[in-house]
From Swiss-Prot:
Residues 288-311 have a biased composition (Polar residues). Residues 236-258 have a biased composition (Pro residues). Residues 563-575 have a biased composition (Low complexity). InterPro entries: G-protein_beta_WD-40_rep, WD40/YVTN_repeat-like_dom_sf, WD40_repeat_dom_sf, WD40_rpt, WDR44/Dgr2. The lineage of its organism: Eukaryota, Metazoa, Chordata, Craniata, Vertebrata. This is WD repeat-containing protein 44. The gene is wdr44. Residues 469-478 have a biased composition (Acidic residues). Residues 264-278, 410-422 have a biased composition (Basic and acidic residues). It is found in: Cytoplasm, Cytosol; Cytoplasm, Perinuclear region; Endosome membrane; Golgi apparatus, trans-Golgi network.
């Protein structure tokens, strides 16, 4: 049924101003014209009748019946109509079904014609019907109003007579046309049968052809639909081709995002914070290429195996994941062209001196700009190539004087000089000089004897700078390994000291050529990986674990053969691999040195990188990742001698990290500003994201909260957090001081998570180490004392997270307590820790310093060897994870700019 709105639109439809009323014509001409128009526009009427609603047609038919009955009582019969009725009756009996359907399409035209004649001028269809009644203007003007009144009743009279005479053929029509009874059953109105008989007996196409041609219409226009004329019509669609393929199905609707979970009672209202869980961290899923989420339980954690690591391609590019970024393609194409030497305005190629003089770099501390050719004198000593590369890209550097300053008074003195306060500057310098003199005298008095001699020797080396050019000038040469090292503590820290009795037990110098940039222990604590400037990864193994890993290598049948790999230089290990399998656990070291925990010769060497190595990462099952300045990440395994896979990047790879729960994935941060989560078995980038900002340089990366979030550090001093499941942005921290020269963010060099306490340790190039609470992103503690202005030095925790260790550019190893021992201090600021302990055992910049994760394996070297002789300890293949653990002993390793690696053991005094 039609709605109320359709009915209102029908009666309230405005008249069409483009249609004009036509004068009336004679009944004969009117009938002839109507029949001709029905045949001409039969096809168009069929289309209109389909769209015509049944309810609207019923209302029109009812009005026609009522008016026709009134007129039939007063009007006489017309003989002309009777003759045509007989012809129509004889013709309709023999018509086909197709002709009947064509005749039914002309129903609205007769209906409109009759209703228009009766309703008069105010009928809204008057103007539309006038198009079909082509007038003779001259005759209508001569006839006048009397002619109009004579023709109109006669037309109505003829239609009524047709309906009465055609009742005879109703039964025959019902038998031939099954569609008409359906309409009658729906309407169930007996009065409508008359109109249906009229429509069924309309003239056929044969009769219309015999009629004389009518006058062509003045305006060719189809009869509009009554309801559609009041509505906005849609655009006309072109006809579909015959041999056209079927239309493409519509695309599936995009699924709606899942509803957000309501925050629980333990969630923090601060949007930038992290969720805090008392019972540890939830083992959430990690997005994989095959499934959206992969729920992993703590008991059954997936891990990487050799079969999946070695399957597929050996060289993986970052562009394999569906054109990850446009910038990658453009940068790669630009690198293929190669660097072009700059030229002068005349076209002459510039010399090296001219190029260096044209590049201006800015000192971040003083704001001074100097040519790059003069910057070598002011750069800090022991600067790494990564810092030099970043300096060329950012045109910024930090002077050597600023690197040695631990306080925030130096920039203030420069400001006072510009303001004319020279007296204040001299007073400050005098206080510094007197303070240092008193401090030196005090230390000399305390370190009487051997310590005083060591102090003089170290001052001599610093004056003549012999330690940086000649590694053999170490103070440890010819000295026993168990001698005490130089120790110092922060001013105002009165003790007791925890590392005052620390000793050097082994020196692994002589293997690395050049600086050692990174060192990492395996999860079990029996393997040490070191890498740096000589492009080689070296694996060191404990003496008591050598047989275990040697048997592992033999078990996998990799001794003496290599697997196929695209790069021949990455296949063969160094000769030390073959030699290492011949010697026993103690034949390769000095027999007098029983305290040395490591074998003096590396267990294996991995070659394949073509530039400095910057970072290392171990998995739980002895896979090793190495990142380099050659823009690649290589995958190794302790049982294999060849590179298992090579992951290519666009720029230097500064940081890598295995996922802590699923080591099939690893995170990589690059100087191209992109953070990538790699899928090792599928050999592709599973997820990636790009940082924003002026300097898009990622300098550190790691996982936190047991892999729930990934965090990166940037060159401009930001720590940006992403959820690992989709690698979407979560929040960020600006690592900087509120005042002083460190109010501008400096490069982040290291990020280490603190398990169990929902905190991270951040190292930056402002010579500060900060501990942040991830629950509210607040600063829990700031550690001062070390010098780290331009290096890639990073701090780390001890095995029980009670201490923090870091290298330094002033050749010391610095150690802090993670939290203050309030029994040692009467009044102390809880969020500042200036009470450090320093160890001097190197004569160059200490580039890396780490604690051993399982010190019990190294400390008890003497006791374990004695027990193995007497009690025949357990087989070497089954090594317990926490054997001989000592709660009061720490093992510390440090490496310097010259390639020296030293092992320290510290036994704390038992306090009863």
């Amino acid at each position: 049924m039609a709605s109320d709105s359709d009915t209102e639109e029908f009666f309230d439809a405005p008249e069409d101003v483009n249609l004009s009323c036509s004068p009336a014509v004679s009944p004969l001409k009117s009938e002839t014209f109507i029949l001709k128009e029905e045949a001409t526009y039969s096809k168009k009427a069929e289309t209109r009748n389909i769209e015509l609603k049944q309810d609207d047609s019923k209302e029109i038919i009812d009005s026609i019946i009522e008016e026709s009955q009134k007129c039939s009582d007063t009007e006489n019969e017309n003989p002309v109509v009777e003759e045509k009725t007989e012809v129509l009756h004889e013709t309709l009996i023999g018509d086909s079904v197709k002709t009947k359907q064509d005749l039914l399409s002309n129903i609205p035209e007769l209906v409109v014609t009759e209703s228009t004649f009766h309703d008069g001028v105010e009928d809204p269809l008057q103007q539309q019907i006038s198009e079909y009644l082509e007038p003779d203007i001259s005759r209508s003007q001569d006839a006048g109003p009397s002619a109009d009144s004579a023709y109109v009743p006669s037309a109505i009279e003829n239609i009524v007579d047709l309906t009465q005479d055609l009742k005879i053929t109703e039964e025959l029509k019902i038998a031939e046309e099954p569609e008409i009874p359906l309409i009658q059953e729906e309407t169930k109105d007996p009065s409508k049968n008359i109109v249906e008989d009229v429509f069924s007996k309309l003239p056929t196409s044969d009769i219309i052809e015999q009629l004389p041609p009518a006058k062509p219409p003045r305006q060719i226009c189809v009869e509009p639909d009554i309801v559609a004329s009041t509505k906005k019509s849609g655009p006309n669609r072109p006809p579909q081709p015959i041999n056209a393929p079927p239309p493409r199905p519509p695309p599936p609707a995009r699924p709606a995002p899942p509803p957000r979970k309501k925050k629980g009672d333990t969630d923090f209202d601060r949007s930038s914070g992290f969720e805090y869980q008392k019972d540890g961290f939830l083992a959430g899923g990690l997005l994989s290429p095959n499934t959206l989420t992969e729920n992993m339980n703590r008991d059954s954690q997936p891990s990487l195996d050799l079969a999946s690591a070695t399957s597929g391609e050996k060289i993986v590019t970052a562009q394999e994941n569906g054109k990850a970024a446009d910038g990658q393609l453009s940068s790669q194409s630009s690198e293929c062209l190669g660097p072009q030497r700059p030229r002068s305005n005349s076209g002459r190629e510039l010399t090296d001196d001219e190029i260096l003089a044209s590049v201006m770099i800015k000192n971040l501390d003083t704001g001074e700009e100097i040519p790059l050719s003069l910057a070598e004198e002011k750069l800090p000593t022991g600067i790494n190539p990564l810092t030099l590369y970043i300096m060329r890209r950012t045109k910024e550097y930090v002077s050597n004087d600023a690197a040695q300053s631990d306080d925030e008074e130096k920039p203030q003195s420069h400001q006072s000089e510009t303001d004319g306060g020279k007296l204040k500057q001299k007073t400050t310098q005098l206080k510094k000089f007197l303070g240092k003199s008193v401090k030196r005298a005090k230390h000399l008095a305390e370190e009487y004897g051997e310590r005083a001699v060591n102090k003089v020797k170290s001052v001599r080396d610093e004056v003549f700078h012999t330690d940086q050019d000649d590694p053999s000038s170490s103070d440890d040469e010819g000295m026993p390994y168990t001698r005490p090292v130089k120790f110092k503590a922060a001013h105002g820290f009165k003790g007791p000291y925890d590392f005052e009795q620390i000793k050097v037990v082994q020196d692994l110098s002589g293997e690395h050529v050049g600086a050692v940039w990174t060192m990492k222990f395996s999860h079990c604590g029996r393997l040490l990986a070191s890498a740096g400037q000589d492009n080689v990864v070296r694996i060191w193994v404990l003496k008591n674990a050598f047989d275990y890993f040697n048997n592992m290598r033999i078990k996998y049948n990799t001794e003496g053969r290599v697997s196929p790999s695209p790069s021949q230089e990455s296949l063969n290990s160094s000769k030390s691999d073959t030699d290492g399998g011949v010697f026993s656990g103690t034949d390769d070291v000095d027999p007098d040195d029983k305290n040395a925990p490591f074998r003096q010769v590396p267990f294996c060497k991995y070659k394949g990188h073509t530039a400095d190595l910057l970072d290392l990462s171990w998995s739980k099952n002895y896979f090793l990742l190495s990142s380099s300045m050659d823009k690649t990440v290589r995958l190794w395994h302790i049982s294999r001698r060849e590179c298992l896979c090579c992951f290519q990047h666009i720029d230097f790879v500064t940081a890598i990290a295995f996922h802590p729960r699923d080591d099939r994935y690893f995170l990589s941060g690059s100087l191209d500003g992109k953070l990538r989560l790699w899928n090792i078995p599928d050999k592709k980038v599973a997820l990636w994201n790009e940082i924003d900002g002026q300097t898009k340089l990622i300098t550190a990366a790691n996982f936190c909260q047991n892999g729930k979030h990934a965090v990166i550090g940037t060159y401009d001093g930001r720590c940006i957090f992403y959820d690992t499941e989709h690698l979407k942005y979560h929040t960020q921290i600006h690592v900087r001081s509120t005042r002083g020269r460190n109010r501008v963010g400096r490069k982040i060099t290291g990020i280490e998570p603190l398990p169990g306490e929902n905190k991270i340790l951040v190292t930056s190039n402002d010579s500060r180490i900060r501990l942040y609470d991830l629950r509210d992103l607040s600063l829990s503690m700031k550690y001062k004392g070390c010098v780290n202005s331009s290096s890639q030095i990073k701090a780390s925790f001890s095995h029980d997270f009670t201490y923090i260790v870091s290298g330094s550019e002033d050749k010391y190893v610095y150690i802090w307590s993670t939290y203050h021992d309030l029994s040692k201090f009467t009044s102390v600021r809880r969020d500042r820790n200036d009470f450090w302990e320093g160890i001097k055992a190197h004569n160059a910049v200490v580039t890396s310093a780490i604690f051993a994760p399982n010190p019990g394996l190294m400390v008890s070297a003497e006791t374990s060897s004695e027990k193995q002789e007497g009690d025949q300890a357990e087989p070497v293949e089954n090594i317990p994870s926490g054997a001989l653990k000592s709660d009061h002993t720490e093992v510390l390793l440090s490496a310097d700019f010259t390639g020296a690696i030293k092992v320290f053991i510290n036994k704390k005094k038992n306090i009863s």
